[in-house]
Amino acid sequence: MSRAQALPDPAAVGYPSFKLILVGDGGTGKTTFVKRHITGEFEKRYEPTIGVEVRPLDFHTSRGKVRFCCWDTAGQEKFGGLRDGYYIHGHCAIIMFDVTSRLTYKNVPTWHKDICRVCDNIPIVLCGNKVDMKNRQVKAKMVTFHRKKNLQYYEISAKSNYNFEKPFLYLARKLTGDMNLRFVEELALLPADVTIDLIAQQKIETEIAAAAAMPLPDEDEDGLMD
């Protein structure tokens, strides 16, 4: 087992540590997302044999500290698929797409298939990033893949810190088996680089909730038709 795969023994360090797989097309904001967590930026390390950066992100919860060892592709997805070593021993995953690029959403099923091929039945969160941008192309009604595969979905904006904590809170609850778990300390995040129109975003969130009550599209459409 490589140094990156050897997570701390919970009994020895006193807190649980989980390998978090972060995937998605290049340019969707994965690295920007994990770098918002200040402590993770200071402690990152590079694993050249697999081509990833591993960032330990700590969260203080009502059950004590929880650490996600976040595996970032470091751009390797631009050269084709990721090696199985990236996925092996993964406890959970985040699939990210860019709401201003339909292609990145269209490729979500491929990323999901890669995860499921190596990891058996782990909790997965789908994140639509860059909701602070005005030129949104993936409309609320188009986002249906998570419903087909029973994934959790969040709209996020890495640059504005919008909903940053939600994917981690959901995964921490699933992995600890405590759906009442909560964060007890404010997250140490970098200051927001941009602002987000919260009124407009709330309208979109309402549309997403309404779309969840609608019948799913045919398998080959996957919500990408207008």
Swiss-Prot record:
It comes from the Eukaryota. The keyword Cell membrane does not apply. One of its GO terms (cellular component) is cytoplasm. Found in a nuclear export complex with RanGTP, exportin and pre-miRNA. GTP-binding protein involved in nucleocytoplasmic transport. Required for the import of protein into the nucleus and also for RNA export. Involved in chromatin condensation and control of cell cycle. PANTHER family: GTP-BINDING NUCLEAR PROTEIN RAN-3, RAN GTPASE. Belongs to the small GTPase superfamily. Ran family. This is GTP-binding nuclear protein Ran-3. It comes from Oryza sativa subsp. indica. The gene is RAN3.
